[in-house]
């Protein structure tokens, strides 16, 4: 659930955590 680069699911978190492009 860590990292940046997507507005979609992060590694199976089920929701966006951060939204950097």
Curated annotation (Swiss-Prot):
Keywords, comma-separated and alphabetical: Antibiotic, Antimicrobial, D-amino acid, Disulfide bond, Protein kinase inhibitor, Thioether bond
Disulfide linkage: 1-13, 7-19
GO MF, one annotated term: protein kinase inhibitor activity
Cross-link (3-cysteinyl-aspartic acid (Cys-Asp)): 1-9
Biological processes per GO annotation: defense response to Gram-positive bacterium; negative regulation of protein kinase activity
D-tryptophan modifications at: 21
Role of this protein: Inhibits chicken myosin light chain kinase with an IC(50) of 8 M. Does not inhibit bovine cAMP-dependent protein kinase or rat protein kinase C. Antibacterial activity against the Gram-positive bacteria B.subtilis, E.faecium and S.aureus. No antibacterial activity against the Gram-negative bacteria E.coli, K.pneumoniae, P.aeruginosa, P.vulgaris, S.sonnei and S.typhosa. No antifungal activity against C.albicans.
UniProt-recorded name of the protein: Tricyclic peptide MS-271
Naturally occurring in which organism (per UniProt): Streptomyces sp
């Amino acid at each position: 659930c860590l990292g940046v680069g997507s507005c979609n699911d992060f590694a199976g978190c089920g929701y966006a955590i951060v939204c950097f492009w």
